[in-house]
Amino acid sequence: MPSTDSIPKSNFDAIPDVIQAFKNGEFVVVLDDPSRENEADLIIAAESVTTEQMAFMVRHSSGLICAPLTPERTTALDLPQMVTHNADPRGTAYTVSVDAEHPSTTTGISAHDRALACRMLAAPDAQPSHFRRPGHVFPLRAVAGGVRARRGHTEAGVELCRLAGKRPVAVISEIVDDGQEVEGRAVRAAPGMLRGDECVAFARRWGLKVCTIEDMIAHVEKTEGKLETNGSG
């Protein structure tokens, strides 16, 4: 199975370049550890994500649009955990799902509606009453300490927002390989997830910066120091 272990470091972009692209409102591709999920997410800042960018994200990802945000933000927006006892293998902290409570929102599933919900999650004046529950965007509660505390895409999204000076809400979704068409049949052959160098190739195809969470941790530790412990959940 392809993994980041087999990819030369030179194939990845420098973290300052990734941060700058993120600051510019671009997608970045972020890979986690091969011993963890061994997957890559498209990540973008929620505050400026457009309908067109959301459409791209839905097309090239699992379609499950998540919005990592800080613990303080989930509290301020009254976003409790989705379940009392989280059985997710990685402890991904899903809150209740939301749509934007807005005149232009229809069913909540369109690219327009989901982009709007994400922007509203990041809006400085956002209030709990600005959202319908349940909805079609899935906020994720990040742990305090960012990627130094937990090596997940949830924390990577919030960390990128912090490093780029953005509002502390990101938008993420796993990148997939949707397989090949089968002529005359309503199926696709050999679907799966993009992994390892396939993710780098995807980033290059679309002109996106690409990095690993491992490199992000190294950058933050070099510039800001280490935490007492480094989580892996």
Swiss-Prot record:
InterPro entries, alphabetized: DHBP_synth_RibB-like_a/b_dom, DHBP_synthase_RibB
Residues binding D-ribulose 5-phosphate: 41, 92, 150-154
Q: Which residues bind Mn(2+) 1?
A: 37
Q: Which residues bind Mn(2+) 2?
A: 37, 153
Q: Name one GO cellular component term.
A: cytosol
Q: Name one GO molecular function term.
A: metal ion binding
Q: Which UniProt keywords apply?
A: Glutathionylation, Lyase, Magnesium, Manganese, Metal-binding, Riboflavin biosynthesis
S-glutathionyl cysteine modified-residue sites: 66
Record-annotated site: Essential for catalytic activity: 136, 174
Q: Which GO terms describe its biological process?
A: riboflavin biosynthetic process
Changes after translation: S-glutathionylation is reversible and dependent on a glutaredoxin.
* Documented EC number(s): 4.1.99.12
**Could you tell me the superkingdom of the organism this chain comes from?**
Eukaryota
Quote the catalytic activity from the record.
Answer: D-ribulose 5-phosphate = (2S)-2-hydroxy-3-oxobutyl phosphate + formate + H(+)
Name the enzyme group at the top EC level: lyase
| Protein's pathway | Cofactor biosynthesis; riboflavin biosynthesis; 2-hydroxy-3-oxobutyl phosphate from D-ribulose 5-phosphate: step 1/1
| List of residues binding Mg(2+) 2 | 37, 153
| Cofactor(s) demanded | Mg(2+); Mn(2+)
* Annotated cofactor note: Binds 2 divalent metal cations per subunit. Magnesium or manganese.
**Physiological role:** Catalyzes the conversion of D-ribulose 5-phosphate to formate and 3,4-dihydroxy-2-butanone 4-phosphate.
Q: Describe, as the record does, how this protein assembles with itself and its partners.
A: Homodimer.
The cross-references to PANTHER family, in alphabetical order and at most eight, read: 3,4-DIHYDROXY-2-BUTANONE 4-PHOSPHATE SYNTHASE, GTP CYCLOHYDROLASE II-RELATED
Q: Which family does it belong to?
A: Belongs to the DHBP synthase family.
What's the protein name?
3,4-dihydroxy-2-butanone 4-phosphate synthase
The gene is: RIB3
